[in-house]
């Protein structure tokens, strides 16, 4: 959430920036959506990780969270994702003005065996052999089916939304908050598994069938790029004070993502390379992201040096912005 709303990577490493009082005053592009109603939906409590602290930066935000719904919680995270989506749809279909909404789901988290609402009997669990699950990064059937249930909930949301007038003029954006450390060797080179890059790898889908043509793109992007891209698609004039970029602006093509780990590493992922540094002791490594990339030792040293400098500069800039990207008056 912090990265999406502020355009700054959460570079604190060992503590969420939303838990740091000095980091809560943040400028966000959401406030440039003038004349838009603004909504936030969460099936549980916004006090978790102090989500509500960062959300206070959004002017006129209408919160729909724990205690707002007639449905009963199914686990510690609150009501089911399906119910949350359908509650949001009830609000959206009543709107007469443009709106910006953030729906934060939580079903694809532990406890996986409690993620699926009992009343959703049309969702059929699938049994898979442990070896097959492991080959594709899943630890057990509960995790696999919770992942599938996320798709089911999105399907129910889209089916409901398509019946309403707002659907044809709305840009839906789906993104994961983080991935899962698992075996990815069936789909990606070994480095993805060895370096736990699956932890950082999430889908990003822009869906607006009446506004956007269908295409699949492979470049490296990150959560900080989402708001500038949405604003660009909506033709909103906005002030960008941080590090995100409009992914559809062909004049700003420089594909990379800065990533951090609670193990004490920072790194930079490009379309071709992954550079990683351990900040606890002097260790830097460079990996190729694809099996077809071949470099000489001299080329590797040059690339590592360049990415090392870039990573250092980006890390320090992100830390500065976390404390200095003030909302203003």
Sequence positions of predicted segments:
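Solvent-exposed soluble domains appended to multi-pass membrane proteins
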Residues: 1-329
């Amino acid at each position: 959430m912090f990265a999406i709303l502020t355009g700054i990577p959460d570079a604190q490493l060992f503590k969420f920036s939303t838990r740091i009082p000095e980091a809560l005053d943040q400028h966000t592009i959401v406030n440039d959506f003038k004349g838009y109603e603004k909504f936030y939906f969460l099936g549980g409590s916004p006090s978790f990780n102090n989500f509500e602290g960062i959300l206070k930066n959004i002017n006129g935000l209408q919160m729909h969270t724990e205690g707002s719904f007639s449905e009963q919680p199914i686990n510690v995270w609150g009501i089911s994702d399906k119910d949350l989506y359908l509650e949001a749809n009830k609000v959206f279909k009543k709107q007469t003005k443009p709106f910006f909404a953030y729906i934060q789901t939580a079903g694809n988290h532990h406890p996986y065996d409690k993620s699926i609402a009992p009343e959703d009997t049309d969702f059929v669990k699938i049994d898979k052999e442990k070896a097959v699950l492991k080959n594709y990064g899943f630890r057990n059937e509960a995790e696999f089916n919770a992942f599938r249930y996320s798709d089911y909930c999105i399907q129910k949301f889209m089916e409901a939304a398509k019946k309403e007038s707002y659907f044809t003029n709305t840009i839906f954006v789906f993104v994961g908050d983080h991935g899962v450390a698992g075996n990815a060797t069936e789909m990606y080179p070994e480095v993805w598994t060895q370096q736990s890059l699956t932890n950082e790898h999430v889908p990003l889908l822009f869906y607006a069938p009446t506004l956007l043509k269908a295409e699949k793109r492979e470049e490296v992007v990150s959560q900080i790029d989402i708001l500038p891209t949405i604003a660009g698609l909506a033709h909103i004039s906005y002030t960008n004070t941080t590090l995100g970029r409009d992914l559809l602006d062909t004049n700003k093509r420089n594909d990379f993502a800065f990533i951090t780990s609670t193990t004490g590493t920072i790194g930079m992922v490009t379309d071709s390379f992954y550079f990683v540094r351990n900040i606890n002791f002097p260790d830097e490594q460079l990996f190729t992201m694809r099996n077809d990339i071949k470099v000489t030792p001299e080329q590797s040293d040059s690339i590592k040096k360049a990415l090392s400098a870039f990573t250092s500069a980006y890390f320090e800039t992100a830390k500065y912005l976390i404390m200095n990207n003030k909302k203003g008056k």
